[in-house]
Amino acid sequence: MKVIDQFKNKKVLVLGLAKSGESAARLLDKLGAIVTVNDGKPFEDNPAAQCLLEEGIKVITGGHPLELLDEEFALMVKNPGIPYSNPMIEKALAKGIPVLTEVELAYLISEAPIIGITGSNGKTTTTTMIGEVLTAAGQHGLLSGNIGYPASQVAQIASDKDTLVMELSSFQLMGVQEFHPEIAVITNLMPTHIDYHGSFSEYVAAKWNIQNKMTAADFLVLNFNQDLAKDLTSKTEATVVPFSTLEKVDGAYLEDGQLYFRGEVVMAANEIGVPGSHNVENALATIAVAKLRDVDNQTIKETLSAFGGVKHRLQFVDDIKGVKFYNDSKSTNILATQKALSGFDNSKVVLIAGGLDRGNEFDELVPDITGLKKMVILGQSAERVKRAADKAGVAYVEATDIADATRKAYELATQGDVVLLSPANASWDMYANFEVRGDLFIDTVAELKE
């Protein structure tokens, strides 16, 4: 990693632990900062805080005392999930204290070039595809960021022979200043996380931070299926490389079942190892990045053909007596579920849907669920999802939790059918995150097979 001294002897407050906060605290300590960690979880239930204290880092737990900011901190590094409406952050900003996320730290110390991937849907799959293609080509793609490996941790071990492939959320990108990837990808932009950002325009602005420091020597890969992406091309200094499944573009595109890059066939769409039109888009974005990094077509084709998907992203789980189970727990919004359904014959699908109620109706989903064999509906949003099912003329049953839903879906399915967990909702009404929800689905499928 690069040795930098801008944090040496500077007082830094790390707000919120989890993986990213813990990693940031250790990195800042290593860089010579005077670190204070503040986390809401009580000390006795906080193994991360206990470990940091043993390492000599000051920790304050069990709440977020505003008087803590009476100290003269030079910087705050916050957990991405903590909203800017948090009183601690509001006070820090009012005092002129810069508020960053650990992504900024990762950029500052990384010896490796950075490829950043953001968007509303497809981030994790595209990040993983890019990482695997680059690694197959000998460029060693190191996955980091929102994909589960703290960027500031991975950046410490990355050399200039590696490539840091970073999945970036809007939450993370709100806290960057100098962050400068060589290539950035925006998979798509849809109205999500409005409860955090306040409006769609603010959400888009957060995503757009990914390109703030890019120049004409850098590449910004955009989804030209969306007019919004086309409109944004005039607002960046970066060189835009488009991808599209709807039209021929000066980049990566789909035509007559083939995936092209600037007029050259790379592979057939039906050779991609995972189903669904959304994965064609993900593959096109990956092809664009790979070609910009001079990866040969054969390596791209072999890697994407062998690609088995990502856990919780349209993940094939098992086959029980001819019934296939797919875990798409990461589908936390309507678009993601629409994309998932596009890969299947609706008449053979039993869909499990519902979760956190964010107040939105599901009318947009009606055309996509029309013709489903059955639905199993659960969660806070159940009444809203049921209204959409009624409009689509789809019969449904209700479930109390994911295990119950999985069992009921299997009972409704017959040989040749698909049980698809694609909730179109976040998990937080019942579960800590979509991973917990997906793991419970996987565990229940395993029990059904016994």
Swiss-Prot record:
ATP binds at residues 119-125. GO terms for molecular function: ATP binding; UDP-N-acetylmuramoylalanine-D-glutamate ligase activity. Its EC number is 6.3.2.9. Pfam families: Mur_ligase_C, Mur_ligase_M, MurD-like_N. The keyword DNA damage does not apply. It is found in: Cytoplasm. Keywords: ATP-binding, Cell cycle, Cell division, Cell shape, Cell wall biogenesis/degradation, Cytoplasm, Ligase, Nucleotide-binding, Peptidoglycan synthesis. Gene3D superfamilies: Mur ligase, C-terminal domain (3.90.190.20), Mur-like, catalytic domain (3.40.1190.10), NAD(P)-binding Rossmann-like Domain (3.40.50.720). Pathway: Cell wall biogenesis; peptidoglycan biosynthesis. One of its GO terms (biological process) is peptidoglycan biosynthetic process. One of its GO terms (cellular component) is cytoplasm. It is an enzyme of class 6 (ligase). Disulfide bonds: none annotated. It catalyses: UDP-N-acetyl-alpha-D-muramoyl-L-alanine + D-glutamate + ATP = UDP-N-acetyl-alpha-D-muramoyl-L-alanyl-D-glutamate + ADP + phosphate + H(+). Cell wall formation. Catalyzes the addition of glutamate to the nucleotide precursor UDP-N-acetylmuramoyl-L-alanine (UMA). Belongs to the MurCDEF family. NCBIfam families: murD. This is UDP-N-acetylmuramoylalanine--D-glutamate ligase. It comes from Streptococcus pneumoniae (strain ATCC 700669 / Spain 23F-1). The gene is murD.
